[in-house]
Amino acid sequence: MLTAQITVEIQGDTHPEAVEAALQGVREAGGTLGRVRAPRLTVNMPASVAAEPVTSAQTVIVPHSVRAGFRGEYRGSVVVLGDVNPGAELIAAGDVIVAGALRGVVHAGYGGTHPDPIVWARPIASAQIRIGDAVARAPEGSSNMRRTDRTERAERAYLQDGMIVIDVQ
């Protein structure tokens, strides 16, 4: 007997009667419909691409979240299509853009060659961010343990008069 909300995944074109039959089966088992969505897609990066060194100041796209222990150095900017979890570190000569929550340590503008580097994430919940030579630390207990809600607005960190400023987008 189901006692929880159920997520139904539908792949491709599906006949409405098939959807109704699935919903009826969930109801008959005592469950309730939580949501209907397409299946989640996992994108695996080929080992040859992951090991390929970046030789120019290009933007690198990381197609997944990064976990604790990951350390990435980039000659240009980096875009992470996921979260940067606590214990992960990103160092970029350019900008650091995170499509999800930023809880790891980042350094944008490393080396001082990129004009006006930024850190952008939804939200910035990191214990420490660095932009150029400036360092910002979160107050004790307010950083990566903060619960993040997917509805949180994006935040942008940038340098202003040599200090890191974070504003809500």
From Swiss-Prot:
Keywords associated with the record: Cell cycle, Cell division, Septation
Keyword Cell cycle annotated: yes
One Pfam short name: MinC_C
Domain of life: Bacteria
InterPro entries, per the entry: CAP/MinC_C, MinC, MinC_C_sf, Septum_form_inhib_MinC_C
Cell division keyword on record: yes
GO process annotations (BP): cell morphogenesis; division septum assembly; regulation of cell septum assembly
Subunit structure: Interacts with MinD and FtsZ.
Family: Belongs to the MinC family.
Protein function: Cell division inhibitor that blocks the formation of polar Z ring septums. Rapidly oscillates between the poles of the cell to destabilize FtsZ filaments that have formed before they mature into polar Z rings. Prevents FtsZ polymerization.
Protein name: Probable septum site-determining protein MinC
Source organism: Deinococcus radiodurans (strain ATCC 13939 / DSM 20539 / JCM 16871 / CCUG 27074 / LMG 4051 / NBRC 15346 / NCIMB 9279 / VKM B-1422 / R1)
Organism placement in taxonomy: Bacteria, Thermotogati, Deinococcota, Deinococci, Deinococcales
